[in-house]
């Protein structure tokens, strides 16, 4: 999405930025991500509403990551190595675009992120 909108990628995270956070191994890896701005209204598209939580444990299974951001891409969450882990596209450019660098479908059906993303996706579909 970022590349299609004019941004760029790190082709290989361990080679290009190091491995202070393991994003990929021989299986699924868990690590923490934190909200860049806990007050950002876009957060509610991906993350469950809770004013006391600003970090989440997610799974990871990727070796590429966002580098230069395209115009209109807003980073909602990053990992400790500063890689974007959750983004949205400014709603002035697109009515609904959310993306994450983890697998919400593997977090469990009762996970707050999975539920929030699913519910907001269905709401966006129903608006069309």
Where are these regions (language model features)?
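Catalytic nucleophile loop
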Residues: 1-8, 103
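Acidic/charged, solvent-exposed loop-and-adjacent secondary-structure segments enriched in E/D, K/R, S/T
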Residues: 11
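Amide-donor transfer/coupling interface in amidating biosynthetic enzymes
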Residues: 14-128
């Amino acid at each position: 999405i970022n590349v299609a909108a004019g941004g760029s990628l790190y082709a290989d995270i361990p080679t290009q930025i190091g491995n202070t956070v393991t994003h990929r191994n021989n299986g699924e890896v868990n690590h923490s991500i934190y909200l860049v701005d806990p007050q950002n209204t876009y957060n509610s598209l991906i993350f469950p509403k809770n004013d006391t939580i600003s970090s989440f444990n997610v799974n990871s299974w990727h070796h590429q990551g966002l580098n230069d951001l395209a115009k209109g891409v807003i980073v909602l969450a990053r990992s400790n190595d500063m890689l974007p882990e959750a983004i949205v596209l400014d709603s002035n450019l697109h009515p609904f675009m959310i993306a994450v660098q983890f697998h919400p479908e593997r977090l469990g059906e009762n996970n707050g992120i999975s539920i929030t993303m699913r519910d907001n996706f269905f709401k966006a579909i129903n608006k069309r």
